[in-house]
Each structure stands twice: as C-alpha cells, then as structure tokens.
Amino acid sequence: MVAVIIKGNEVAEKKRAQLKEEVVKLKEQGIVPGLAVILVGEDPASRSYVKGKEKGCEQVGIYSELIEFPETITEERLLTEIDRLNGDDRINGILVQLPLPKHIEEKAIIERISPEKDVDGFHPISVGRMMTGQDTFLPCTPHGIVELVKETNLDISGKHVVVIGRSNIVGKPVGQLFLNENATVTYCHSKTQNMKELTKLADILIVAVGRPKMVTADYIKEGAVVIDVGVNRLETGKLCGDVDFDNVLDVAGYITPVPKGVGPMTITMLLHNTVESAKRAGVVCK
C-alpha cells in the first residue's frame, strides 16, 4: 500500500477560491476585510513570510497594510501602533510578525492586540475560548492541520491522535482542536520514554518538532494519517520535514509532503480568520 499524498497547496487554493467568493459578497454590502501586518527589522525569513501574506490578501481581495519599523523601535512605540490599529475600523485583523527583537517582550505585544482582531489566535483570551470550545479565531497552523485531516474524509470522532511536539504555536493547540473534535489525544515530547509504542497506536499522527526525518516507518501504524509540520533545510539546501517521507510512504494511509503540505494552509487560515472578523464587525467602508 502506498499512501495517498495530501496536497496542501491544492487544498489551500480551493479554500482561497471560496474565500474570494465570500469577499466579493461582503464588498457588495460595502464591507472590505482588512489585514494589518507589522514587520520589525530586516530578517529575510520574516520578510518572505510577510510577502506570502500580502500575496494571499491580494489573491482573495482583502485590503492589506504593511507597517514596517526598524529593529531599534521601542516596545512603547510598538504598543502605541497596535492601539491605533485596534481603533481603526478598516482593519479587521492585526498580525505582528514574529520573532521580535530581544528588547521587546512578545507576550506584551500579543496581549495588546484586541481579541476581536487577533487573527493569529495567539491572544490568551482566544486560547481560553479555544480550550473551552467557544467560538473564536483558531491558531492558523493547527486549524490548517485539522482541515487537511478532514480532506481525507476520515471521521475524527473517536480516533486516536498522537501529537509529537508541545509548542504553544502548534503542538499544544492542535491537540486541543482534535480534542474538540472528540478525538482521544496523546502528546509526546522530548521526555517521553516509550514514544514508538505510543505513535504506533495513532490513527492520526501529527509531527511538529523541527528534527529532520526523525519519524520513520517503525513509528507508524499501518494506514495512519501522517501530518508533517516540520520544515528543515538540509546541508544540500533541500527542504525536508520531520518525517522520513520516502520511508513512511509505504506504511501510512495518508501523508503530507514538505514543502506544499501544511505550509500553504497556514496563510489560508489567516485569510479565513480575517474574513470572519470582517463579517463579525460588519463595518461598512465609506
């Protein structure tokens, strides 16, 4: 058996086409979704991510605003800018590109964003609402992962999901989202002693650790859905995931590639959250 490859780029394009239709309908009502992205400094990777977000906004018809600051900006000045955007009716989503310079406390910046405009889903209020199953903006990568699993038409309810990784960005929240879908969830991490025993029980395995090709066929239950969140660059310059793709291909039932797997879904879910925020706000642009 060779696994079915879940092509995240194709799923993302399909969802963006749906979002584009929604944006057209909103604009007919005088509502234009708007996203503000704050970029601090000149980090090439951050700038590349921001370009991807701008391109996504343009693709679906979202108004986007890029606000750039030098690396020397004070925390106070950055907080003042967030306050301004919180009060700007044209802006439905605020995103601060991480990481920030060391002299700026990321926690303070994230918590200053209004929960109504927290399209990244990182604000503690958003996290709390997610934990209790309330309606909120879900964190983009975890939400994208759940959507990819749903593409397999597998009934998540009652399935055993194993998550390798416990970061606040992916590992912890993705487990919670699957729990909200009535799955049984197990977390594995660097202190887990019997990892392979646990992962071989997984109907759905999520790998998000940042270790190239760590997960091999002997971690996988036959027919499992394997979602590879890792993006690692080898010495050859080639990108690879946390899963040894070729090794696992003959055991898994479904698998995401790297690249063109989880990555395209992250920005797509950001666009989704921005459109949802605009719907909730319902502010007609003049």
Swiss-Prot record:
CDD domains: NAD_bind_m-THF_DH_Cyclohyd
Pfam families noted in UniProt: THF_DHG_CYH (PF00763), THF_DHG_CYH_C (PF02882)
Top-level taxon in the UniProt lineage: Bacteria
Catalytic activity: (6R)-5,10-methylene-5,6,7,8-tetrahydrofolate + NADP(+) = (6R)-5,10-methenyltetrahydrofolate + NADPH; (6R)-5,10-methenyltetrahydrofolate + H2O = (6R)-10-formyltetrahydrofolate + H(+)
GO BP annotations, alphabetical order: L-histidine biosynthetic process; methionine biosynthetic process; purine nucleotide biosynthetic process; tetrahydrofolate interconversion
Single GO MF descriptor: methylenetetrahydrofolate dehydrogenase (NADP+) activity
Record-linked PROSITE patterns: THF_DHG_CYH_2
Example of a GO cellular component annotation carried by this entry: cytosol
Amino-acid biosynthesis is among the record's keywords: yes
Residues reported to bind NADP(+): 165-167, 190, 231
Enzyme Commission designation: 1.5.1.5, 3.5.4.9
Entry keyword set: Amino-acid biosynthesis, Histidine biosynthesis, Hydrolase, Methionine biosynthesis, Multifunctional enzyme, NADP, One-carbon metabolism, Oxidoreductase, Purine biosynthesis
Annotated metabolic or biological route of this protein: One-carbon metabolism; tetrahydrofolate interconversion
Subunit structure: Homodimer.
NCBIfam families linked: PRK10792.1, PRK14186.1
Annotated family: Belongs to the tetrahydrofolate dehydrogenase/cyclohydrolase family.
Role summary: Catalyzes the oxidation of 5,10-methylenetetrahydrofolate to 5,10-methenyltetrahydrofolate and then the hydrolysis of 5,10-methenyltetrahydrofolate to 10-formyltetrahydrofolate.
Protein name, entry field: Bifunctional protein FolD
